[in-house]
């Protein structure tokens, strides 16, 4: 690993980022953080039809929510001149050649190859075209797309995740780098950018392993330094299906809007499918210390929303007041009550936003459920005077128990129903002082208060 690595996350702004995109983004950012390196956000927006400014803005917003602040940023759409220069170099070297087949012609050719038991790779027929042949095709209105001529050899590298790896480029079609309309596909701009800014480590999903064989040859053809490569396992759904931007409920935006903590999403996205126990890690620095690419599993990493729920709850239960003070204020909790309220309710929350429900129980109005009127009337007469404190609930229930003989559930449940309207919730020794004597007395009397 270089002394000061430069890594990159390069999404296409063609949809909202999902939990599967969070994995490479975080692995790269944490890798750089651990090694004192830098993180580049590059928008691969060469797909002019599908790339939108809305999705580009959402990428930055989602990364910020995860706690990732890029050190460098650029868009590929602003760097076309660099790609043009590289393409001309490859043409001059005989490595980029024009092809004129239509998609339909290529499809028929592939079917014939399969029918003869041959691998369906491009047969380089365009290399046999003469100048006159090409002129005739262009006179028909055809415009060439451009393929990179691969050396038919094995490309090997020491993968940061998988160890010794290789791709036999003889088994691959020469990849199209430039479309007939002159726009670039992913491969050439990616290599040019990595070379130009000095990316040292390319950390990405294992679905890019084959691309690495092609890209290594491109780096070589352009006379550029070859970065280290690492290909991590992919997140899948709990059923083992691949994630895509079409799964809106697993988009980072939807998870944020649903009230999940970024630390819970980070922890699950990074630790799932690793040698580390999957657990909530609140600190980015601590999470970075746990990232060891060589200890990632080769098996798919299954993302289970139920596991996210549990992890989020564990984080919320341990959150100090300072971490949620502003959010509690936004939910309507007065500053003077926030400390006692948060201490009372946090162990009952799965998400911070659920605190709003318990503040409504405290401040009202609550319609009491008086299931045993005689018992509640006797309990109301024994209600201590104000002010209430942490010992009020025990003193009161001891007195009610002595007066009525009720104990256990028969003692506590009717009181909980009358005071909160619910059969579950935080410890009433903590909640009762927040409710206060006046509201408690009115609820015990059957009033909505």
From Swiss-Prot:
EC numbers on record? 6.1.1.17
Keyword terms: Aminoacyl-tRNA synthetase, ATP-binding, Cytoplasm, Ligase, Nucleotide-binding, Protein biosynthesis
**Where found in the cell?**
Cytoplasm
Q: Example GO molecular function term?
A: ATP binding
List this protein's GO terms for biological process. glutamyl-tRNA aminoacylation
Ligase keyword on record: yes
Motif 'KMSKS' region extends across 242-246
What is one Pfam family matched by this protein? tRNA-synt_1c
Residues annotated as binding ATP: 245
One Gene Ontology term, aspect cellular component: cytoplasm
The protein's predominant localisation is cytoplasm
> Sorted alphabetically, which Gene3D superfamilies does this protein's record hold?
1.10.10.350, HUPs (3.40.50.620)
Please give the InterPro entries that the UniProt record associates with this protein: aa-tRNA-synth_I_cd-bd, aa-tRNA-synth_I_codon-bd_sub2, aa-tRNA-synth_I_CS, aa_tRNA-synth_I_cd-bd_sf, Glu-tRNA-ligase_bac/mito, Glu/Gln-tRNA-synth, Glu/Gln-tRNA-synth_Ib_cat-dom, GluQ/Sye
Catalysis performed (reactions): tRNA(Glu) + L-glutamate + ATP = L-glutamyl-tRNA(Glu) + AMP + diphosphate
Q: Where is this motif: 'HIGH' region?
A: 11-21
Q: Which domain of life is it from?
A: Bacteria
Which SUPFAM superfamilies does the record cross-reference, listed alphabetically? An anticodon-binding domain of class I aminoacyl-tRNA synthetases, Nucleotidylyl transferase
Query: Which top class of enzyme applies to this chain?
Result: ligase
Give the record's family classification.
Answer: Belongs to the class-I aminoacyl-tRNA synthetase family. Glutamate--tRNA ligase type 1 subfamily.
How this chain assembles, per its entry, is: Monomer.
Q: What does this protein do?
A: Catalyzes the attachment of glutamate to tRNA(Glu) in a two-step reaction: glutamate is first activated by ATP to form Glu-AMP and then transferred to the acceptor end of tRNA(Glu).
Could you tell me which HAMAP family the record lists for this protein? Glu_tRNA_synth_type1
Q: What is this protein called?
A: Glutamate--tRNA ligase 2
Species in which this protein is naturally found: Methylorubrum populi (strain ATCC BAA-705 / NCIMB 13946 / BJ001) (Methylobacterium populi)
State the organism's lineage.
Bacteria, Pseudomonadati, Pseudomonadota, Alphaproteobacteria, Hyphomicrobiales
**Gene that codes for this?**
gltX2
């Amino acid at each position: 690993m270089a002394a000061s690595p430069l890594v990159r996350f390069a999404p296409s702004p063609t949809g909202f980022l999902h939990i599967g995109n969070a994995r490479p983004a975080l692995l790269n950012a944490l890798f750089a953080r651990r090694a004192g390196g830098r993180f580049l956000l590059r928008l691969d927006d060469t797909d002019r039809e599908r790339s939108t400014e809305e999705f580009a803005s959402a990428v930055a917003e989602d990364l910020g929510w995860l706690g990732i602040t890029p050190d460098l940023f650029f868009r590929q759409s602003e760097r076309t001149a660099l790609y043009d220069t590289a393409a001309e170099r490859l043409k001059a070297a005989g490595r980029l050649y024009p092809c004129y087949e239509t998609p339909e012609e290529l499809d028929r050719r592939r079917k014939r190859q399969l029918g003869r038991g041959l691998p369906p790779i491009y047969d380089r027929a365009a290399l046999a075209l003469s100048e006159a042949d090409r002129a005739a095709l262009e006179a028909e209105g055809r415009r060439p797309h451009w393929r990179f001529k691969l050396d038919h050899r094995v490309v090997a590298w020491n993968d940061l995740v998988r160890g010794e790896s290789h791709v036999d480029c003889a088994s691959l079609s020469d990849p199209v780098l430039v479309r007939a309309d002159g726009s670039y596909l992913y491969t050439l701009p990616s290599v040019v950018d990595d070379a130009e800014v000095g990316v040292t480590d390319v950390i990405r999903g294992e679905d890019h392993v084959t691309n690495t064989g092609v890209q290594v040859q491109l780096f070589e053809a352009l006379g550029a330094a070859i970065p280290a490569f690492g290909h991590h396992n992919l997140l899948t759904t709990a059923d083992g299906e691949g994630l895509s931007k079409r799964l809106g409920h697993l988009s980072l935006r939807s998870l944020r809007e649903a009230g999940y903590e970024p630390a819970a999403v980070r922890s699950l996205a990074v630790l799932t499918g690793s040698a580390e126990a999957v657990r909530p890690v609140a600190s980015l620095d601590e999470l970075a210390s746990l990232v060891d690419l060589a200890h990632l599993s080769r098996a798919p990493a299954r993302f289970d929303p139920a596991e996210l729920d549990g992890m989020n709850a564990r984080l919320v239960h341990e959150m100090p007041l300072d971490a949620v003070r502003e959010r509690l204020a936004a939910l309507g909790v007065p500053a003077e009550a926030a400390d006692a309220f948060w201490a009372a309710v946090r162990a009952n929350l799965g998400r911070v936003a659920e605190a709003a429900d318990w503040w409504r129980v405290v401040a009202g109005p609550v319609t009491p459920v008086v299931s045993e009127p005689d018992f509640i009337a006797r309990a109301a007469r024994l209600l201590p005077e104000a002010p209430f404190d942490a010992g009020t609930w025990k003193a009161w229930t001891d007195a009610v128990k002595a007066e009525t003989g009720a104990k256990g559930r028969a003692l506590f449940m009717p009181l909980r129903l009358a005071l909160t309207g619910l059969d579950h919730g935080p410890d009433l020794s903590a909640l009762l002082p927040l409710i206060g004597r006046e509201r408690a007395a009115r609820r015990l009397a059957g009033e909505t208060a």
